[in-house]
Amino acid sequence: MKHLTEMVEQHKRGNTNGIYAVCSAHPLVLEAAIRYAHANHTPLLIEATSNQVDQFGGYTGMTPADFRGFVYQLADSLNFPQSQLILGGDHLGPNRWQNLPAAQAMANADDLIKSYVAAGFKKIHLDCSMSCANDPIPLTDEIVAERAARLAKIAEETCREHFGESDLVYVIGTEVPVPGGAHETLTELEVTTPDAARATLEAHRHAFEKQGLSAIWPRIIGLVVQPGVEFDHTHIIDYQPQKAIALSAMVEAYDTLVFEAHSTDYQTPQSLRQLVKDHFAILKVGPALTFALREALFSLAAIEEELLPAKTSSGLRHVLESVMLDRPEYWQSHYHGDGNARRLARGYSYSDRVRYYWPDQQIDEAFARLVRNLADDPIPLPLISQYLPLQYARVREGDLNATPRELIISHIQDVLQQYHAACQGVTSQNA
C-alpha cells in the first residue's frame, strides 16, 4: 500500500508527517471525513475494528465486504477517488472470541483475516495479545507473536490468491488499557518502555522468520505502543513528551517502522502535533468524532425544542435515553455511580458509548425527523450562535450553509482539522 509506505519513508527522511485513521462506521462521520480529505487533496485511511465488522457481521451487522461496499459507495457519491481510500482492519485476531478455547478462537481469527484481506483491506493490525479461555494470563510475547505470524501467513496467501500479489502493510503490538477508552477512572498511565517495544518487535521478527515471512518485514510499518495518552469518562491524560523521550528515540533505529498511537481522542492540537513529531506517526481517532456528532445533534435538538411544540418535535434526547435504558448492554459495565452520574455518562461521557446506539431504528427515525423539522425553515441565526458558535461564525462569513446536515458535518470536521494539521504540518479550511 504505497500511500502508507511512502508516508513512512518521508517521515524517516525527517519530515514531521503522519496519517490519521478514522475509526468509525457512522455514515455522517465518514461523509465528513471523505469530504474533508477531498477538499484537502489527501488520502484517507478508514479503519474497521474486529468488534464492528467481522465475517459474522460484528455489532454493525456488516462483513468486511459489506463495509468496503458501504465506504466505496459513499466515496463514489462524493466524487472521492477510490485510489485515495485506504481501508484498515484494527485489532484483528481472537479479540471477539476470548471466551472460547484458543484453538477455536484462532480458527475464527483465521477466517476473520481472510475475510478482511479478500475484501480489499490493505492495512492489517495483527493483535493476538488477548488471552483465550484456556490461556495463561498474560500471554508471553512469544505466544502472541506466533499467533500473529500465523495470521500474517494467511493474509499473504489470501492477498496473492485474490489480487495476484501482496501489497499489504502490517501493524503489530497493542496498547494498554483496552481498546476504546479505559473502563475505570485514570490518574496516571505507564508509557511503554523501549525494552518492551524491542521485545515485541524481536519476538515478532523471530516468529515471522519461522513462518518463512522474513521478506515481508519491511511492510510491517507500525508498532502499537502506549505513549501515555488515554481518556476515561470525564478525564483526559495528556501527552507528556518528556515521558516518551526514550521510547521515541528507540524507533529511530528501525528504517521502515513508526509508532501507531491509539486513544489519541481529545488530545490538544499541540499534543497531536508533538506525537507525530515524536514518531507516533499513525494517529487513531474514533470516539472523538462520534462525540462531535453527538454534540451537534444535542445542539440541534435544543434548537428544535426552542422552535417547535413538543408534540411535533423529534424528541431525540428522550428517545435516545429510553433506548439506552431498555438495552443497557453497551454501557452498563462501563458507567458507574448513582443514577444521576450514569445518566450524565450516557449522554456526555468521553468514552461515548452512545455511539453504539445510533443505528437503532427508533433513534434513527428520531434523527431523521429532527433533520426534517429543522430543514423546513431557515434556522434562526441567534439560535445557531447560541448552540453552535463555531459554525455560526462560518455561516455569517458565507462559508457554511445553515442546514442541519451541513452544521453536523462542519462540527465533526473541526476535530478532523486538528488531526490533519498534526499530520500535514498545515492548517486547512473545512470542506
From Swiss-Prot:
It comes from the Bacteria. One of its GO terms (biological process) is D-tagatose 6-phosphate catabolic process. It holds the Pfam family GatZ_KbaZ-like. Transmembrane segments: none annotated. Component of the tagatose-1,6-bisphosphate aldolase KbaYZ that is required for full activity and stability of the Y subunit. Could have a chaperone-like function for the proper and stable folding of KbaY. When expressed alone, KbaZ does not show any aldolase activity. Belongs to the GatZ/KbaZ family. KbaZ subfamily. Forms a complex with KbaY. This is D-tagatose-1,6-bisphosphate aldolase subunit KbaZ. It comes from Citrobacter koseri (strain ATCC BAA-895 / CDC 4225-83 / SGSC4696). The lineage of its organism: Bacteria, Pseudomonadati, Pseudomonadota, Gammaproteobacteria, Enterobacterales.
